[in-house]
Regions:
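Aromatic- and acid-rich polysaccharide-binding/catalytic face
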Residues: 124, 154, 192-231, 255-256
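N-terminal carbohydrate-binding/catalytic regions of secreted carbohydrate-active enzymes
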Residues: 64-137
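Substrate-binding cleft of extracellular glycoside hydrolase catalytic domains
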Residues: 105, 111-187
Length: 532
């Protein structure tokens, strides 16, 4: 008996179909698929052993602290701080740090008393911006708090990255610093990215010590994790020599645990732990003063900085230890839950495919289910950390639903297509062109975003693997004019996207592979299918 198998032989070749279920081929493919699924998630989530940062009894110097819960933002109107949250936060931080650094005075009136209660010292900061009224209010509160809490406030910071944002001039900032110095007893400083200290040397004489921000991930020329500590050491050495005898404090340094790759700088929990543990060991050995960014993950920062902005914390937004400072650390701590989700997708694929008859279908169906389980699960994990707004959740739901529909179409194509499976297959077959069109549209929109507005966007490559592969292997009839335009947009964006990201960006290459080699090829093959 012979049958055309368009799912596997799109040019219309034929293959034999047996009357018996190919049990051993099916069993082999199922075991291989399950092994691949388990290996994929365990490989991503397995605990990595690193040298601990310090002994459990040794406290670190300082950490940046903002008192926002995971559902809060400083832009909330009206904004209400939660005193019980601040109290619990400081109790937790007091077990690992000697001091905390703040960035604004507004709403933090209770902080000195809480710091005193938990034995913490404070570096308090006034938020300086382009509005002179707001700035004057912040500076007045800074002076008052420093004088009223001299036992816990060890130093004051007049402005944070204000020159970077170009909200005041160097001369205006120096006047503010001198005003504060004349009215407090504590050392006074200003904090900014290290390059801006070099661009504005007139600020150095006004401060008692320099506070520089050293974030290798955000550098114009990002450092990979293996070179990041050397870069920090070199910059610190330059400042120590240039501005001696004034002390230089590293006021912000750290590494993100989630987010998009920048050239060779890859965010991950393991890389964050590598950087923090290595930096602290180096700083303690060199006798540097430092402040780590930051105490807790801040999801609200994702709105302005993309996913990466929300994940610089030593603890997550639920105040759970991320394993950055000590013990084993996992890049995907929820890998076992995603494994369960993947298992359900795998089983669902087998159920849709049913009792296949050909040996080739028996091999392909379980492997298709395993691939879909991995890619859809990885897309879900990416969405968990990147999605910020209702519109973005709608986009996630659209792509997830699209993947499941395409997976169902592919599984039914591999089935014997009898009974309800035949009816479902025919329904999918009539609408397959629109599934391709929606996939192409989503890929084209993503490509345009990654070409024209890439800085804070992650690479959603895993969301397109299943649709691209399915319709590459089995092209279907599509609306020609629309698909031709989408194919051109995606294909034209590959080179500029790679050029912007740099040829060493593995995530960018992953997107180029999925969108270029797979998606463009799939759309092109679909364009060549004539309507029946």
């Amino acid at each position: 008996m012979q049958v055309t198998c368009a799912a596997l032989f799109p040019d219309g070749l034929t293959m034999p179909v047996t009357s018996r279920f190919p049990f051993f081929a099916y069993l082999f493919a199922c075991l291989l698929g399950l092994f691949a699924l388990g290996g994929f998630w365990y490989g991503l989530g397995k605990p990595v052993i690193l040298p601990d940062v310090v002994s459990a009894t040794h406290k670190l110097q300082c950490a940046s602290y903002t008192p926002f819960d995971k559902d809060q933002s400083p832009f909330d109107v009206p904004f209400k701080l939660r005193p019980e949250r601040m109290d619990a936060d400081l109790a937790l931080l007091a077990t690992r740090f000697e001091c905390i650094r703040t960035y604004s005075m507004t709403g933090l009136e209770a902080l000195p008393d809480l710091a005193r209660k938990h034995g913490l010292k404070l570096m308090i900061g006034a938020w300086v911006n382009s509005n002179p009224v707001d700035t004057a209010k912040e500076v007045d509160l800074l002076i008052a708090s420093a004088n009223a809490n001299a036992d816990v406030v060890t130093s004051v910071i007049v402005g944070n990255e204000t020159l970077l944002r170009k909200e005041v001039t160097g001369a205006q900032l120096a006047i503010l610093i001198n005003k504060v110095k004349s009215q407090v007893k504590q050392p006074v400083t200003y904090a900014d990215v290290w390059e801006f200290w070099l661009k504005h040397p007139e600020i150095a004489p006004a401060v008692d010590f320099l506070t520089i921000h050293l974030l290798p991930y955000w550098e114009d020329d990002p450092s990979n994790i293996d070179a990041a500590l050397q870069h920090v050491a070199e910059v610190r050495q330059v400042f120590g020599n240039k501005f001696a005898p004034k002390d230089v404090m590293i006021g912000e340094t750290g590494w993100p645990s989630e987010g998009r790759q920048r050239e060779t700088a890859l965010p991950s929990r393991v890389n964050e732990a590598k950087f923090i543990r290595g930096f602290v060991a180096m700083a303690e050995q060199q006798g540097w003063h430092y402040n780590l960014i930051e105490a807790f993950d801040q999801p609200w920062k994702r709105a302005s900085e993309g996913a990466v902005g929300g994940y610089w914390g030593l603890f997550d937004a639920d105040r759970q230890d991320k394993g950055v400072l000590a013990g084993p650390v996992s890049n995907v701590p929820y890998w076992s839950q995603w494994l369960v989700v993947g298992g359900l997708i795998f089983i669902g694929t087998l159920i849709l495919g049913g009792r296949v008859r050909s040996t080739r279908a028996a091999l392909v169906l379980p492997l298709l289910g395993a691939l879909a389980a991995c890619s859809i699960g990885a897309w879900g994990d990416l969405a968990r950390v990147t999605t910020r707004f209702a519109s973005e959740w709608l986009w996630v739901a659209l792509l997830t639903g699209l993947n499941l529909l395409v997976l169902a179409h592919a599984a039914l194509t591999l089935s014997t297509r009898t009974g309800w499976r035949a009816q479902a297959f025919n329904a999918f077959e009539r609408r397959a062109g629109w599934l391709v069109a929606v996939t192409g549209f989503a890929a084209a929109v993503t490509m345009l975003e990654l070409v024209f507005d890439p800085r804070y966007r992650s690479f959603p490559s895993v969301a397109f693997i299943v649709p691209a592969l399915v319709y590459l292997c089995r092209p279907v009839s599509v609306p020609r004019r629309e698909i031709a335009l989408l194919t051109f947009i995606i294909g034209a964006g590959i080179a500029p996207q790679l050029y912007q990201e740099g040829l060493q960006n593995q995530q960018a290459w992953g997107w180029a592979l999925v969108s270029g080699l797979m998606m463009v090829a799939a759309l092109w093959r679909c364009l060549r299918v004539r309507k029946g």
